[in-house]
Amino acid sequence: MMLSIVRSVDVVLEIDLAAIRANFQKISTLVGDKVKVAAVVKSDAYGLGLVDIARTLIDAGCDLLFVANLDEALLLRSSFSRVAIAVFRDEFDRFGTWYRSHGLIPVVNNCKELHAVGTAGEPQSYFLNVETGFSRFGLSVGDIQREYLLRTFERYRPSIVLSHLACGECISDPMNQLQRDRFRTVYDLLKPTRGSLSASAGVWLGKSYHFDMVRVGSALYGIHNAGVQTNPLKPVVKLRARILDVRSVPAGEAVGYGATFRTDRASRVAIVGIGYKHGLPWSCANKIFVRLAEYSAPSIGRISMEYMIIDITDVPARRCSPGTFAELLSEDFTVNDLGAAAGVSPQEALTRLGAGCTRKYLNLFPPSAAFTANRPTEAMSNPSRAKSRPMDKQALI
């Protein structure tokens, strides 16, 4: 018999859904009416919760979602019956039955998948990925030119041709123009197929990079391009963690693993219930501050698995007693700032925190007509009837 212990939550990641809606609308306004805004919700919506974030975006008017794999796509389809769902990976030539039976759109990444689409036995909508300088996925420009000469695209034309910028976050990098020009070659060849070159970073590069659609992920979640001086996006997350204990430490004493910090005065320190288990980067030790009401307190010593230690010597005791919550992310210190302090991308920092912390959603508005139209039918609500269960890929290999 297992003993169940009810415990208070020590770490809370607050997610402002109104801010996500506002960011979607802001980007839609920025790119203009002629450019579609699709939402990237891969990796559990960057750790913020796939279904909850998808519901928010559908409510904001989004009608196309991109996910990483079929597992995520099937989870979405079991909740939303009508929204278009595109899958970046999981090959159509191996899993075509799953795509067709659940109305999913494959992103075709090589010639083998392309030909599998053509021999599917029934029309299959698909997006075509072209490699323009990232060296990750996609058909080369030469591959596409060859298939064009073979009239492949006359028999089964892609709905959208897409690519991905390697250096979009650096506005002046010449790679951006090189990739845009390569993409333009394929885009012009395959007209009237629509084109999508830019993800979040490319939104800020100007209209010549927008084509017919932008695929926005990190920008929706408040991560801004470091190359853009003004940030019009709303911050989406706040991170709070509970103070578990307060201690007095003499001058000259070591703090934490490795004795990487020693007090230079008689100090008061607080042990905060957040560590790298929760996604706080180990590398941000001794580099960040937490907020305690109107006061700030520096992180000292290494980040451990469950805890971090902060110096509260200059903070009044009434502001930092055990049980008090310290604020690690806010409008003043964002996930961009945390990533910079830790030497990781803000996308990595956010995804780790989202996976490791208890989430609390703010501003859950009533669903709009757009969301209501996407409510699953009875069959879609029942995974056994809709067959929208997590994929057993091993059985198909």
Swiss-Prot record:
Swiss-Prot/TrEMBL keywords: Cell shape, Cell wall biogenesis/degradation, Isomerase, Peptidoglycan synthesis, Pyridoxal phosphate
Chain residue ranges for the region called Disordered: 373-397
GO molecular function, one term: alanine racemase activity
Secreted in keyword set: no
One cellular-component annotation, GO: cytosol
Metabolic or biological pathway: Amino-acid biosynthesis; D-alanine biosynthesis; D-alanine from L-alanine: step 1/1; Cell wall biogenesis; peptidoglycan biosynthesis
UniProt cross-references to InterPro entries, sorted A to Z: Ala_racemase (IPR000821), Ala_racemase/Decarboxylase_C (IPR009006), Ala_racemase_C (IPR011079), Ala_racemase_N (IPR001608), Ala_racemase_pyridoxalP-BS (IPR020622), PLP-binding_barrel (IPR029066)
CDD domains (UniProt xref): PLPDE_III_AR (cd00430)
Obligatory cofactor(s): pyridoxal 5'-phosphate
Catalytic activity as recorded in UniProt: L-alanine = D-alanine
One of the protein's GO biological processes: peptidoglycan biosynthetic process
Binding residues annotated for substrate, in chain numbering: 136, 305
E.C. numbers: 5.1.1.1
SMART domains, per the entry: Ala_racemase_C
Modified residues (N6-(pyridoxal phosphate)lysine): 42
Pfam families per record: Ala_racemase_C, Ala_racemase_N
Active site (catalytic residues): 42, 257
Role noted for this protein: Catalyzes the interconversion of L-alanine and D-alanine. Provides the D-alanine required for cell wall biosynthesis.
Similarity annotation: Belongs to the alanine racemase family.
HAMAP family per UniProt: Ala_racemase (MF_01201)
Record protein name field: Alanine racemase, biosynthetic
Organism of derivation: Mesorhizobium japonicum (strain LMG 29417 / CECT 9101 / MAFF 303099) (Mesorhizobium loti (strain MAFF 303099))
Lineage, highest ranks first: Bacteria, Pseudomonadati, Pseudomonadota, Alphaproteobacteria, Hyphomicrobiales
Protein's gene: alr
